[in-house]
Every structure is written in structure tokens, then in C-alpha cells.
């Protein structure tokens, strides 16, 4: 993308990759030092706090959205990043989280797809057989964004959210208890230790996990198309065997919310207040 941008505009771009969990602290430190990058690719959670802190140039972002046309963006992506008279950052992409599961094992055991708490718990009883097969690899490392993403998905599945159309909404005690009881069950069927995206992918790719929750970024890897993260279920890193045995669920339900819910992540380009604004806006 950086090379294509330079070819089109003549503007060179240095891409600085950092770990997702370090994004907040790195941006805050760079802001204090007056050394922010021109543009930051970030999640929704940073849009409004960074705008309020003076890290993001909301006028520049608003000008971009207006020049491209508000109608070319999903209204929800704009409203979630809305500030007075504009937006904090420019929506660029997003994805829907997935329950990734071994469809071959489910079919062999006569199990329904893991579209609900109940279906997952039934599958755990039949498929959890450690250490050769873990029923689930739940996120348990509390300082990883991954755990927040997985937990939010599980909460929404049961119709629990801390916000509603009026703003803050207290958590429903009974529904929240159902969420936590379910999460305990998938943690119990997971390996010991602090787990996040890395372990869940590694164990699933090794054929040692029946279910994980992951983003669509796993799909190319699952098909053996990424050298740095190949499936290890067999000796061929380019094999499509695991992909052929995998099923995907996006809408997931709890007992108090039979219609279920999906969880999505929206990403933004934020132009910083240290940027060469005209170049950054391109």
C-alpha cells in the first residue's frame, strides 16, 4: 500500500509496525515528545479519547470525509467516531469476528454448529480430550485487546451491553451471570496459562483445538497462504487440509438472546496534530 501510494503521489511513507496492545502507550508517549507519525491506523476505542487529548486533527479528518462524501461511508462507522461538527478519524475498513470450528469433528460426533452457548457446551462435553484435543482456546490474558474482543462478542451474544441508545446502561445481573458461567466453561476446556490470539491460532493450526474465536485475518493462514503462520496439522505448510475441515460461525447466541449477535471491529486512519497535514490527507 505504501509503495502504491508513493507511485501515485510521489510521497514516501515509512510504515512503523507495532503490537496492537502497545498502540495506546506508544501514541501517548509520541504525543508527549512531539513525535507523532502523520497517520495512525487504529481501532475505534482510540478515536474519541485521542481527539479529546489533542492527538488527532479532527478538522483534517472531517475535511476528508466531506470531500469523499459522507454517503460513501457506512453511517455507523461515522457516528461512532463523531465529534462536534465532524469526525475524529476516517473509517477505512473493518471485519466481523468468527467462531472457527472443526466441522469434520462436529459432523462425526453428530453435533450442531456452535451457533449458541448451548451448542458450544454440548460440543465441549464430546470433543474436549486434552492434551490431544482441547474443546476451546479461550482468551485469558487480561492485558491483551484480544480478550476484550472475545468477551465483548460473548456478552453481545447474550444481549448484554454497557451502552444503549441513551448512553450508559447498567448490566443485567441475570444475563451477565449467564455470560460469565459460559465463559468459565470455555476457559475450563482450554489449556492452562495466559492465552491470547497466538496460542489459539497455534493450537487450532496444530489440530489440537475444536473451537476458537478469531478474526477473518486467520483465513489466508488457514488455507496455507501465509509463510509466517502456516497450518501445522500436517507436514505441508501450504496444505488446505485444515481449511477443508473448518466451519465458520459469525452470529452467536446466548440463552437470553436467541436471535444472537455478531461482533464487528471498525478501523480508522487518524491524522495526527504533528502531521504534515496536506500530505497526510492524501
Which positions does each model-derived feature cover?
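Extracytoplasmic "Venus flytrap"/periplasmic binding protein-like
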Residues: 4-73, 104-115, 210-211, 221, ...
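Short helix-initiation/N-cap motifs at beta->coil->alpha
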Residues: 17-26, 45, 117-122, 193-206
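Beta->alpha turn/N-cap motifs
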Residues: 41-46, 197, 214-219, 265-267
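Hinge/lid segment of periplasmic solute-binding proteins
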Residues: 44-96, 121, 147-150, 237-250
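Extracytoplasmic/periplasmic solute-binding protein
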Residues: 84, 88-90, 121-168, 208-209
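A bilobed periplasmic-binding-protein/Venus flytrap-type ligand-binding module shared by bacterial periplasmic
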Residues: 100-103, 264-278
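Glycine-centered hinge/linker elements that transmit conformational signals in sensory
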Residues: 124-126, 165-194, 242, 246-247, ...
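Periplasmic-binding protein-like
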Residues: 237-269
